[in-house]
């Protein structure tokens, strides 16, 4: 009798097979003497669509809503049906005695496996592999500590409740809004409050009125001492009066006080913090960062589990620090690593905190030594960010002295603060020295003459627009960006971790861009006209982050066995009735402000112009008609002058490529340039890209080489 291991992806399945020395490869699984490992392809089973409950639901009608199934159904995803049949046959195999779930260790990973097992009707015992990295050592250690599957039943119930609630609310709210206003509109418990967060910031900026204010400083022996102000001076004349009073007067040093301080590195990365830092440093979007992390985790085995919300490690990991450091010797930080390897580490260090680690600890390097030349540029950047933060947290704190000098001139007090570094500590990693040593020796009681008096003009600044990095952080802490009028709700949001999860926020932002509710211009995220109207037409409960925070709090209670999942689902059904009825009874109107005079070639209705991340397209205004046409899109063709990516306008022989520098090429000119560049041949990479993306061959720069390609 053998144990069947169910992994989430083929790559992880192969890693497990390698760690357990399983040699016999078959179609869809790998077998050994004791184990068989098979895999899903992400989800193999999903919630049924409305039309799979009743064919009449294929047509979207307001009268049919709400659609509330008595019992939720699941279906096998047609694209992955072949693999599902393989997994099913293995689960039901008489030679299989038990199932070991080895999907991602978290709520969604549990759902992937349990939906498959439930669909098959599994009755065999279940065990759980729970690991935070897929290195050979981690897998082998994990198999020595397999848990009983029953210990994760509550986790599954929470995942299932989340999935069913999102279906019930999302399907009905979206269909209600779309059919009521005859427009492609989408609602969701996370995406709609996210639009509201961006809208609130946008309003704050639009209504902001800058105000001038003034400060005064005196210069003593080359050092500026600032006037201690009880208020912000908006009238320059007030400071001019003070200037007149102290001019040519003698001052006195009242106090010279030094205070030693220390600062620690920023916490180890969780996913949101890493996505924010990657955007700040490299302008990498959250989705791009997550995908890169997945490669580092699954393919290269260089980092631990990415989808974590924790900034800490568990104290039992203290003995693994040295081997992780040895792995980083392969990087440019090797000199700092050598200094650390000789040290001993204690679980009393600030990075260890069992209470602040739930499913997974912070993202840190594994013990696998990186082959830098095998990493892509993005993978290298993200790995180095993680290694850098890991090392900073192991290094000594930054020690410095804050020297404060208080002075008096007439009836006015002045202050000078200087930071004097004592020990760079973790700052030595990047040599972050921005302060200087105070060379003048001020003494208490010392008299001085003022060399110069200056009045400085300042202006209040509006808050900045969100970018993809800062919006993630705002979703994690929405209570800081929306006026909730109740401290209780702010506490709920803080406790529940905001709206969405570390694993879903990047997808939500991407979806809002794709549905044209948000747009990003020069890194500034703004709400589109469509996004504003979605907020105006939506029931207020769905635009506030409070609701989704309350849901998340209940899901966390379900995970802990402290709340009934069926009660939660019934609450969601009641809520859905309320939302649908509000939409039905609304007398508001939706206005397409981007309607064009171009007729849809399919149904004849006028099309609307929408912005996408890579350009613009025309979409039929009728949500039942799926016709789309590209107006312009960014291509991979580079400008011969400035090397930037060119934008394609139009299609076919009439297409034109334009660059921001002003360079323009017709399709025939582009074809000739690419033929000359490639000698009429096309690379395997370009061929694969064409096959995967199904680009229009008329507007592919390599079309002459591709046109004879048989697919």
Swiss-Prot record:
It comes from the Bacteria. GO terms for biological process: DNA recombination; DNA repair; DNA topological change. It catalyses: ATP-independent breakage of single-stranded DNA, followed by passage and rejoining. The record marks 60, 167, 175, 307 as: Interaction with DNA. The active site is at 305 (o-(5'-phospho-dna)-tyrosine intermediate). Gene3D superfamilies: 3.40.50.140, Topoisomerase I, domain 2, Topoisomerase I, domain 3, Topoisomerase I, domain 4. CDD domains: TOP1Ac, TOPRIM_TopoIA_TopoIII. It is an enzyme of class 5 (isomerase). PANTHER family: DNA TOPOISOMERASE 3-ALPHA, PROKARYOTIC DNA TOPOISOMERASE. Releases the supercoiling and torsional tension of DNA, which is introduced during the DNA replication and transcription, by transiently cleaving and rejoining one strand of the DNA duplex. Introduces a single-strand break via transesterification at a target site in duplex DNA. The scissile phosphodiester is attacked by the catalytic tyrosine of the enzyme, resulting in the formation of a DNA-(5'-phosphotyrosyl)-enzyme intermediate and the expulsion of a 3'-OH DNA strand. The free DNA strand then undergoes passage around the unbroken strand, thus removing DNA supercoils. This is DNA topoisomerase 3. It comes from Staphylococcus epidermidis (strain ATCC 12228 / FDA PCI 1200).
């Amino acid at each position: 009798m053998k144990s069947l291991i169910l992994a989430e992806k083929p790559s992880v399945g192969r890693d497990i097979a390698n760690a357990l020395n399983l040699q016999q490869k078959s179609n869809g699984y790998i077998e050994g003497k004791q184990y068989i490992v098979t895999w899903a392809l992400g989800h193999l089973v999903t919630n049924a669509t409305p039309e799979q409950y009743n064919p009449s639901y294929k047509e979207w009608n307001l009268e049919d809503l709400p659609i509330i199934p008595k019992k939720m159904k699941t279906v096998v995803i047609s694209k992955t049906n072949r693999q599902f049949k393989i997994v099913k046959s293995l689960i039901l195999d008489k030679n299989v005695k038990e199932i070991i779930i080895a999907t991602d260790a978290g709520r969604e990973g549990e759902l992937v496996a349990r939906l498959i097992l439930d669909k098959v009707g599994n009755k065999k015992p279940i065990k759980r592999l729970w690991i935070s990295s897929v290195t050979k050592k981690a897998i082998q250690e994990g198999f020595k500590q397999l848990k009983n599957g029953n210990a994760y039943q509550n986790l599954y119930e929470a995942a299932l409740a989340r999935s069913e609630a999102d279906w019930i609310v999302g399907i009905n709210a979206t269909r209600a809004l779309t059919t009521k206003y005859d427009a492609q509109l989408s609602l969701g418990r996370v995406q709609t409050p996210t639009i509201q967060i961006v809208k609130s910031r946008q309003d704050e900026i639009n209504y902001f009125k800058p105000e001038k204010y003034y400060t005064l400083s005196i210069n003593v022996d080359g050092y500026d001492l600032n006037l201690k102000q009880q208020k912000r001076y908006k009238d320059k004349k007030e400071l001019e009066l003070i200037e007149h009073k102290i001019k040519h007067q003698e001052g006195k040093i009242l106090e010279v006080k030094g205070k030693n301080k220390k600062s620690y590195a920023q916490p180890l990365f969780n996913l949101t913090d890493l996505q924010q830092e990657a955007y700040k440093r490299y302008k990498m979007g959250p989705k791009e960062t997550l995908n890169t992390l997945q490669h580092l985790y699954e393919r290269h085995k260089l980092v631990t589990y990415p989808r974590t919300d924790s900034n800490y490690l568990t104290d039992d990991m203290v003995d693994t620090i040295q081997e992780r450091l040895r792995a980083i010797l392969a990087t440019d930080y090797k000199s700092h690593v050598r200094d650390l390897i000789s040290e001993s580490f204690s679980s009393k260090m600030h990075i260890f905190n069992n209470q602040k680690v739930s499913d997974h600890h912070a993202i840190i390097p594994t013990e696998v030594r990186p082959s830098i030349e095998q990493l892509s540029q993005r993978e290298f950047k993200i790995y180095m960010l993680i290694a850098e933060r890991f090392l900073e947290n192991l290094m000594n704190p930054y020690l410095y002295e804050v020297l404060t000098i208080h002075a008096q001139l007439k009836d006015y007090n002045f202050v000078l603060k200087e930071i004097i570094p004592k020990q760079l500590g973790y700052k030595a990693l990047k040599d972050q020295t921005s302060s200087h040593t105070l060379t003048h020796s001020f003494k208490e009681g010392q008299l001085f003459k003022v060399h110069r008096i200056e009045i400085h003009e300042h202006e209040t600044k509006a808050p900045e627009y969100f970018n993809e990095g800062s919006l993630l952080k705002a979703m994690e802490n929405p209570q800081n960006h929306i006026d909730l009028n109740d401290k209780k709700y702010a506490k709920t949001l803080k406790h529940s971790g905001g709206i969405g999860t570390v694993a879903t926020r990047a997808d939500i932002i991407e979806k809002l861009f794709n549905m044209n509710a948000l747009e990003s211009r020069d890194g500034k995220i703004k709400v589109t006209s469509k996004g504003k109207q979605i907020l105006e037409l939506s029931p207020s409960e769905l635009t506030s982050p409070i609701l989704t925070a309350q849901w998340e709090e209940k899901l966390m209670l379900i995970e802990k066995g402290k709340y009934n999942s069926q009660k939660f689902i019934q609450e969601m059904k009641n809520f859905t009735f309320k939302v649908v009825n509000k939409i039905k009874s609304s007398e508001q109107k939706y206005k397409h402000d981007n309607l064009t005079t171009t007729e849809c070639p399919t149904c004849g209705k006028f099309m609307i112009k929408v912005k996408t991340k890579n350009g613009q397209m025309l979409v039929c205004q009728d949500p039942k008609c799926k016709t789309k046409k590209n107006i312009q899109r960014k291509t991979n063709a580079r400008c011969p002058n400035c090397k930037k990516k060119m934008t394609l306008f139009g299609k076919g022989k009439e297409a034109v490529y334009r660059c921001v520098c002003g360079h323009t090429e017709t399709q025939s000119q582009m074809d000739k340039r690419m033929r000359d560049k490639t000698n009429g041949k096309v690379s395997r990479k370009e061929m694969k890209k064409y096959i995967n993306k199904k680009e229009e061959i008329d507007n592919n720069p390599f079309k002459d080489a591709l046109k004879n390609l048989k697919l």
